[in-house]
């Protein structure tokens, strides 16, 4: 599955200008400062070791790629790029930030939690330029090439970083319905109303193949069952909770009840004439 996640926070995008691009051969010239480290922690050899241990680079080699890993470092956003050896075939594009996330959910604020310390995935693309789409693996919205099928391995490693660094959670905003469906759990929307809406969509589109359901949402062919108004996919933050207070909140009866109320209050369907 190709994961296509885009955080919709313009202030957090990589600033204009030439970023620092690093390869193994460049390390001698950049010194040992944090400017040369992905997320301020991983020099390129250490980052390659992380990807090796996660099974990401071995999987690419098995498919005939000789992967090259690069880092681009901006003021707030750090970017990990993996390409084929010729540099022309982009395989992995991961952009991340660390941030303090203001909390708006009343039930979470009532627990005294006003800001979350999170590791955030601003963008992630995993693609296999040499693969082809098939009936069994159809094109998903946002895809140029089929996915690598390495999303879980990479996310597991990133989640481990967030846990090891004492973060409250790992955050992303799923660009498409299929992203949210593939990564829940462990991810859930922090806003109980959003989680309820997502669960209602998942329930009512359960009989539709995920690629078709996601495409239908993008095309405005999913409608509110009561009003027949088109439904848009405009999600907020999904969080994989790590700290005990946030885990307890997402497992609480208050959160579950609010999610259930939002889910049960909504019904969706494909528009008349839309392919099922």
Where do the PLM segments sit?
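Context-gated lysine
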Residues: 2, 6-9, 88, 167, ...
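A conserved beta-strand-loop-helix scaffold within acyl/acetyltransferase catalytic domains
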Residues: 49, 53-137, 185
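Mobile, glycine- and charge-enriched loop segments
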Residues: 81, 85, 103, 113-145, ...
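Acyl-donor binding region in acyl/amide transferases
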Residues: 109-188, 193-204, 209
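Intrinsically disordered, low-complexity, charge-dense segments enriched in Lys/Arg
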Residues: 2-48, 53-57, 68, 195-276
């Amino acid at each position: 599955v190709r994961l296509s996640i885009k955080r919709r926070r313009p202030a957090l995008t990589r600033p204009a200008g030439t970023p620092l691009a690093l390869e193994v051969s460049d390390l001698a010239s950049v010194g040992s400062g944090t400017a040369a480290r992905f997320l301020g922690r991983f020099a390129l050899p250490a980052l390659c070791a992380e990807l090796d241990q996660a099974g990401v680079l071995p999987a690419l080699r098995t498919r005939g790629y000789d992967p090259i890993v690069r880092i681009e470092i901006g003021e707030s956003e750090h970017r990990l790029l993996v390409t084929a050896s010729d540099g022309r075939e982009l395989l992995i594009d991961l952009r991340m930030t660390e941030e303090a996330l203001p909390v708006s959910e009343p039930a979470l604020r009532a627990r005294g939690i006003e800001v979350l310390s999170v590791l955030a995935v601003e963008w992630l693309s995993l693609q296999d330029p040499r693969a082809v789409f098939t009936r069994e693996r159809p094109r998903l919205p946002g895809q140029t090439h089929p996915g690598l099928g390495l999303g879980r391995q990479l996310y597991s490693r990133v989640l481990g970083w967030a846990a090891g660094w004492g973060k409250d959670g790992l955050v992303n905003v799923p660009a498409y319905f299929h992203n949210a469906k593939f990564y829940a759990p462990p991810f859930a929307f922090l806003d109980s109303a959003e989680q309820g809406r997502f669960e209602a969509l998942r329930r009512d589109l359960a009989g539709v193949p995920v690629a078709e359901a996601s495409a239908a949402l993008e095309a405005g062919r999913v409608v509110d069952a009561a009003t027949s108004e088109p439904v848009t996919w405009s999600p907020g933050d999904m969080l994989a909770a790590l700290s005990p207070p946030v885990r307890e909140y997402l497992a609480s009866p208050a959160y579950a009840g609010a999610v259930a109320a939002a889910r049960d209050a909504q019904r969706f369907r494909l528009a008349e004439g839309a392919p099922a």
